[in-house]
Curated annotation (Swiss-Prot):
Its EC number is 1.3.-.-. One of its GO terms (molecular function) is oxidoreductase activity, acting on the CH-CH group of donors, NAD or NADP as acceptor. Reduction reaction proceeds via syn addition of hydrogen for double bonds. It is found in: Cytoplasm. It comes from Archaeoglobus fulgidus (strain ATCC 49558 / DSM 4304 / JCM 9628 / NBRC 100126 / VC-16). Its main location: cytoplasm. This is Digeranylgeranylglycerophospholipid reductase. Pfam families: FAD_binding_3, GGR_cat. Pathway: Membrane lipid metabolism; glycerophospholipid metabolism. Binds 1 FAD per subunit.
Length: 387
């Protein structure tokens, strides 16, 4: 009998397993893939604050350090933002293959059992416990646990069966494609974001430096607005921008841009990370929120074991923690995202022109909003309930 079984060894799952094990719980962490951290399905960016509040930074899993972001409007108007203003995805670019394994190793060091090539086939709640059916190398076996934590990604089998989440609609998920490229000639102290409805309908393109002339070059599009695949939009972006380099890796995937879900718990069950749609609806970034959610899930699991109460009512303490941390931001950024996808390229150019050339490092958010409102007064009405 385990206290906690965690499914999925990404940042959320490994963090949950590590935190629960550190509280003295008997923990099992399973990952269906052969290697933790592969394939990489994100741009790998995270702010310094988001990573340093949980870990002592190890240069082995830092691919690059960036000091700001450059954002390009469709007409190439450039906006330069400081690291502090650029959000949760700017500061470090991680080497996710190494970082994810590092967090899983910390979970094991804390006492968690970690199995790779192990998939969750099914689960059943019975008599206040959860029976979890696992499959490894073609063999099935069952384990019993008091708490099941689903960190099994955007299409969470656990979340759907528990009735916590439903299948996402085409306007609630971004389709993403990304190349790892080498031989690039870029200033590696910045991350780069490219906007435009023609370029990336409902999303944006990005370049995240990884050092030594390499970078993640990717794009995210909203399937409801897109007329082609994400990869086709990515290839068109690279050709249009004249990006010359060698493609050494390709990944594709989906990122939830749902916003804040009502609850991430059911009896005996908690969801964390992409499984709970914790990714930022504007940026699609999810590492920072996943780490925080995993930490909160592990802490609440320990409290539940101590109280011997695994009901949804008790586990809603987890909802309170993640909602108080980043729930408001998810709600706000979902509303901003809905406004953003309505903007045509002409309006994006106009807004960018209103703040381009200004020293944003010395401007408050309120001052920037004021400049944007001068360029587009209707924004004041559209966004009145966000600030």
């Amino acid at each position: 009998m385990y206290d906690v079984v965690v499914v999925g060894a990404g940042p959320a799952g490994s963090m949950a397993a590590k935190t629960a094990a550190e509280q003295g719980l008997k923990v099992l962490l399973v990952e269906k893939r052969q290697e933790i951290g592969t394939p990489v399905r994100c741009a790998e960016g995270i702010s310094r604050e988001s990573i340093e509040k949980f870990f002592e930074v190890d240069k082995k899993w830092i691919a690059a350090e960036v000091t700001g972001a450059k954002i390009y409007a469709p007409n190439k108007t450039e906006i330069v933002m400081s690291e502090e203003m650029a959000g949760n995805e700017v500061g470090y670019v991680l080497e996710r293959k190494i970082f994810d394994r590092h967090v899983a190793r910390l979970a094991a060091k804390a006492g968690a059992e970690v199995y790779v090539k192990t998939a969750m086939v099914d689960f059943e709640r019975k008599d206040g416990k959860v029976k979890v059916k696992l499959r490894r190398l073609g063999e099935d076996w069952e384990v019993e646990t008091k708490i099941l934590i689903g960190a099994d990604g955007v299409e969470s089998k656990i979340g759907r069966k528990a009735g916590i989440i439903k299948t996402l609609k085409l306007n609630e998920v971004e389709s993403c494609a990304q190349y790892l490229m080498t031989g690039l000639d870029i200033d590696e102290s910045y991350t780069y974001f490219y906007l435009g409805r023609e370029l990336a309908p409902g999303g944006y393109a990005w370049i995240f430096p990884k050092g030594n002339g390499s970078a993640n070059v990717g794009i995210g599009v909203l399937p409801k607005m897109a007329e082609r695949t994400a990869k086709e939009y990515l290839d068109a972006f690279i050709e249009k921008e004249g990006i010359e380099g060698k493609i050494v890796e390709f990944v594709a995937g989906a990122v939830p841009v749902y916003g804040e879900i009502e609850t991430a718990v059911a009896d005996n069950i908690m969801l964390a990370g992409d499984a709970a749609y914790h990714a930022d609806p504007i940026t699609g970034g999810g590492i920072a929120n996943a780490l925080s959610a995993g930490y909160y899930a592990g802490k609440v699991a320990a409290e539940a074991v101590q109280k011997n109460d695994f009901s949804a009512d008790f586990l809603r303490r987890y909802d309170e923690l993640w909602k108080n941390d980043f729930g408001k931001k998810l709600r706000r950024n979902k509303k901003l995202q809905l406004k953003f996808i309505d903007m045509d390229d002409a309006l994006l150019n106009k807004l960018a022109g209103a703040i381009a050339g200004k020293n944003l490092r010395e401007m408050s958010v309120a001052a920037i909003v004021k400049e944007l409102l001068k360029a587009h007064p209707k924004l004041l009405w559209d966004l009145k309930d966000l600030f």
